């Protein structure tokens, strides 16, 4: 009886609604039914990428979704020729073998495919690449926790080096926007990297298939500078050497090493 009364009451209320109100109500219910599974899957993907600058909860997911409204194109090369820096610190790279890996759709960049072998990562990459490269530049850099990825170890420009003089550090705007951060590796997750590259070096990296720009990197966007680049995880020792070359070039650009000092091999 109680169920019948409740249903009767519901039908009575619906009968008093206008056709427009009923259509709107049905539309909202239908849209919610369609959107909920999509949002649920997307939220699960957000959690699977692991720790980042966003909290690992629904609040962090909302932050990421809002920032995604500012997403930029990530693989075009023309943008680099519009930047003032024309020097290079990186030698010509070989083409990366195979196709590009699939990347998460969020602004938190992580690889979904072509994942690195865990044994190789433990032996050659995790807590090794970033410290090893930085150890060759202790006069200008230091290691600390990333300003972008709070679980990653990063290379920074020393605080004692001034960055407000373009004659001293031509990359001063890039250095300022990254808060002196040069490079970090997500070695707690998939061993991909983020780092700052001179425009022509970034162009070389993208052209040869080794990475892509950060989705928020670009002029007029509330994010990292255009030079902020995402590198795919190295899958073997040869690719690891190329990645170290690229990190070396990043340090050369951000510390204003002589432009003629082209990085060809990690030593």
Swiss-Prot record:
Question: Glycans attached where?
Answer: 4
Q: Which GO terms describe its molecular function?
A: oxidoreductase activity
Q: What keyword terms does UniProt attach to this protein?
A: Glycoprotein, Membrane, Oxidoreductase, Transmembrane, Transmembrane helix
> What Pfam families does the annotation carry?
Luciferase
Q: How does activity depend on temperature?
A: Optimum temperature is 10 to 18 degrees Celsius.
Task: Locate the coiled-coil region(s) and give their ranges.
Answer: none
Reaction(s) catalysed by this chain's protein: 3-hydroxyhispidin + O2 = (E)-caffeoylpyruvate + hnu + CO2; 3-hydroxyhispidin + O2 = 4-[(E)-2-(3,4-dihydroxyphenyl)ethenyl]-1,7-dihydroxy-2,3,5-trioxabicyclo[2.2.2]oct-7-en-6-one
Q: Where in the cell is it found?
A: Membrane
Give the highest taxon in the source lineage: Eukaryota
EC code(s) of this entry? 1.-.-.-
Keyword hit for Cell membrane? no
The protein finds application as follows: The availability of a complete eukaryotic luciferin biosynthesis pathway provides several applications in biomedicine and bioengineering.
Q: How does activity depend on pH?
A: Optimum pH is 8.0.
Q: Which GO terms describe its cellular component?
A: membrane
Q: Which residue ranges traverse the bilayer? A: 17-39
Query: What topology does it adopt in the membrane?
Result: Single-pass membrane protein
* Keyword Transmembrane listed: yes
Function of this protein?
Luciferase; part of the gene cluster that mediates the fungal bioluminescence cycle. Uses the fungal luciferin 3-hydroxyhispidin as a substrate to produce an endoperoxide as a high-energy intermediate with decomposition that yields oxyluciferin (also known as caffeoylpyruvate) and light emission. The fungal bioluminescence cycle begins with the hispidin synthetase that catalyzes the formation of hispidin which is further hydroxylated by the hispidin-3-hydroxylase, yielding the fungal luciferin 3-hydroxyhispidin.
Family classification: Belongs to the fungal luciferase family.
Protein's recorded name: Luciferase
- Biological source species: Neonothopanus nambi
The lineage is:
Eukaryota, Fungi, Dikarya, Basidiomycota, Agaricomycotina
